[in-house]
Regions:
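Terminal amphipathic alpha-helical/low-complexity segments used for targeting or macromolecular assembly
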Residues: 1-80
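Soluble, non-transmembrane catalytic domains of enzymes that act on hydrophobic metabolites at membranes
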Residues: 3-32, 95, 111-112, 119, ...
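Left-handed beta-helix
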Residues: 80, 85-86, 91-92, 97-106, ...
Length: 187
């Protein structure tokens, strides 16, 4: 508990967490025309609440308090409908819009300024050991119901269409649609 208090009120970790929170609120304000104030985002956006609580759980996970991290994560899932494993790494400016049903697996890595819509899964494909979830680059947009499954990279600025099932690497700037996912456009 002393470690947690030191983290939140005293350390570089606490400062970084608040910096991430500000970036996450700013992302919602910039990307959602329905967002009217930062207070509204902080109180009424379940995607923001899930990411904020994940950042706490992730810190606990990385400091050996894995059970407590899982408890925070599961309470967040029950309250928001968004499941983010505390081992997952999230960049700044993540916006989960209409987040019900979003799942982000343990070894997933999400870059900065990423947008995820409802029912997105960043998951694995089985019981592999080690890295088994995707790495999402900066500025990626993943549409509603898309599944990105496996230990590969989605390049910076890529767009994954609604309902796509992506099982292999996506180049930077590509647009991927369909099941199985296929590149239909490159920038």
């Amino acid at each position: 508990l002393t470690e947690v208090a030191a983290f939140l009120f005293h350390t570089q970790g606490g400062i970084a967490m608040f910096r991430h929170w500000r970036a996450d609120i700013r992302a919602v304000m910039e990307r959602d025309p329905a967002a009217r104030s930062t207070l509204e985002v902080a109180l009424c956006y379940p995607g923001f609440r899930a990411v904020r609580r994940h950042r706490r759980a992730h810190w606990l996970w990385n400091h050996g308090m894995k059970l407590l991290a899982r408890i925070v994560s599961q309470r967040t899932r029950r309250r928001t409908g968004i499941e983010i494993h505390p081992g997952a790494t999230l960049g700044e400016g993540l916006f989960i819009d209409h987040g019900m049903g979003v799942v982000i697996g343990e070894t997933a890595e999400v870059g900065d300024n990423v947008t995820l819509y409802q029912h997105v899964t960043l998951g694995g494909t089985g019981k592999d050991v080690g890295k088994r979830h995707p790495t999402i680059g900066n500025g990626v947009v993943i549409g509603a119901g898309a599944m990105v499954l496996g230990p590969f990279r989605v390049g910076d600025g890529a767009k994954i269409g609604a309902g796509a099932v992506v099982l292999k690497q996506v180049p930077a700037g590509a647009t991927v649609v369909g099941n199985p996912g296929r590149v239909v456009r490159m920038f």
